[in-house]
């Protein structure tokens, strides 16, 4: 996706996969940014594993062991049929980690390359496979153009980070071009758990997988979507763009009750 899908001047800084050996001598594939290892492949390749023996579950994996359903559309549909599922909304896995990259140009290149790959992936079975694009919202005008491009190619859903750059929160009018594009195209914008942009105050998550392990991390992730949704709602975005659709992914649903009570009290 990245080596062949990004501009030539970005390839040296793009995510790349290499073989590594851990302290136990086990060889695996890992993602690198430049010469920095950030995560092993196994972090997002646990599909099909059983939980009867948790000791067998680890993040040490090689590409050859990844199920073809992860990257071949026909194989994905075969696996879905085994589970009695007719179709799927295809979303990035490892790609979501890249929202923590500081280099905005690299992130834009990653999103563009992934979106191109995604269009090819879902186009073979457009009724059964629906793709979710990735948008870098650091430059909202650029994000709006990329969203419109993806819609023209058949994509109707896109991820935006659950927390944007700290100096331009979602209440900032700078995002109006993006909201307008989503409103006019009917696109669903989604905010996925743990997709904060780089260096957001109070967020420990980075591109390195080790930053995902603190015990307090998981039970507090709904804070970010609550903050983002509150910013958007009280900035009047939904009134100014009445057809806009914005959703939450993997934050579960229980968090919404208390904010709804607080919204009522606030007005």
Residue ranges and their predicted role:
Residues 1-267:
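Helix-coil boundary/capping segments in enzymes
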């Amino acid at each position: 996706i990245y080596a062949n899908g990004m501009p030539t001047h970005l390839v040296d800084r793009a995510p790349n996969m290499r073989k590594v050996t851990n302290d136990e001598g086990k060889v695996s594939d890992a993602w690198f940014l430049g010469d920095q290892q950030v995560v092993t492949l196994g972090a997002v390749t646990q599909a099909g594993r059983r939980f009867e023996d948790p000791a067998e579950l680890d993040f040490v994996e090689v590409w050859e062991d990844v199920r073809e359903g992860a990257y071949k559309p026909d194989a994905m549909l075969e696996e879905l049929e085994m589970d009695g599922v007719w179709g799927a909304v295809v979303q990035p896995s490892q790609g979501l980690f890249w929202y923590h990259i500081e280099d905005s140009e690299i992130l834009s290149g990653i999103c563009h390359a992934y979106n191109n790959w995604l269009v090819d992936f879902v186009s073979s079975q457009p009724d059964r496979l629906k793709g979710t694009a990735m948008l870098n919202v650091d430059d909202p005008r650029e994000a709006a153009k990329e969203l419109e491009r993806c819609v023209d190619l058949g994509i109707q859903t896109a991820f935006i980070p659950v927390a944007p750059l700290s100096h331009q929160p979602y209440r900032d009018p700078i995002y109006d071009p993006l909201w307008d594009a989503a409103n006019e195209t009917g696109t669903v914008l989604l905010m996925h758990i743990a997709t904060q942009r780089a260096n957001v105050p109070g967020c420990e998550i980075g591109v390195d997988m080790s930053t995902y392990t603190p015990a307090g991390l998981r039970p507090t992730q709904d804070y970010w979507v609550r903050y983002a949704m509150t910013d958007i709602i009280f900035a009047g975005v939904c009134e100014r763009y009445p057809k806009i659709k914005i959703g939450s992914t993997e934050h579960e649903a229980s968090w919404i009750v208390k904010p709804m009570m607080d919204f009522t009290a606030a007005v």
